[in-house]
Amino acid sequence: AIDKRIKCVACQVPLVSGFRNIQRLVRQDFLAPNRAAMDQDRAARFRGEPPAMVPVVDPDPLAVSALPTPDSWEWFSKTGKRRAPAWNNEVTLRSIEMLMEYEPSAHLERISPTPLLMVVAALDHLTPADLALEAYQRAREPKKLVLLPGGHFDAYVKDFETASGAARDWFLEHLGSSG
């Protein structure tokens, strides 16, 4: 949105509002304890201590994790492990705190006249589809929406050909071919 050297934008199962996303993913009664843990982590890092780590996923949806959805557990514990066997199930608590402050949709109206493609999964609960569709409505032309039938991780497996094909076609249309 800010760098006009960018000739086109494609986003797939986008996170459009970190704050609203966290409000959906984390139970309300967990927010205050999570905030307290983040405050303690920030103070510890200031003292030179290592950052607090939390699991990315956990089979228990009530346990502390960065991505507390069943499809996240399925993806990272099975598909992700198969594709990236060296992956460690941990992320800094600071990363979650920074996610809460990440608001890319604040710039959405300023992307135009750069062409925008949004690939949204209709059943996405990790980066909620309704938030992405709301953001798409706010975006100005030129824009295009591709709605996938599945959930968040289906964009990388079951619906990969559709998602990646849409991005490829978008880039070819707006960037041309180099061959």
Kindly give the residue locations of the regions a language model identified.
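Alpha/beta-hydrolase-fold enzymes
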Residues: 1-76
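Active-site nucleophile elbow and catalytic-triad environment of alpha/beta-hydrolase enzymes
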Residues: 24-25, 90-108
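Conserved alpha/beta-hydrolase "acid-adjacent" motif
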Residues: 100, 120, 125-131
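Active-site phosphate/pyrophosphate- and oxyanion-stabilizing loops and adjacent acidic/basic residues
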Residues: 106, 133-134, 169
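Short beta-strand/loop motif that positions the catalytic acidic residue
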Residues: 111-112, 117-120
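Active-site-adjacent alpha-helix of alpha/beta-hydrolase-fold enzymes
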Residues: 127-144
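Catalytic histidine-centered segment of alpha/beta-hydrolase-like enzymes
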Residues: 150-164
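C-terminal alpha-helix
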Residues: 166-178
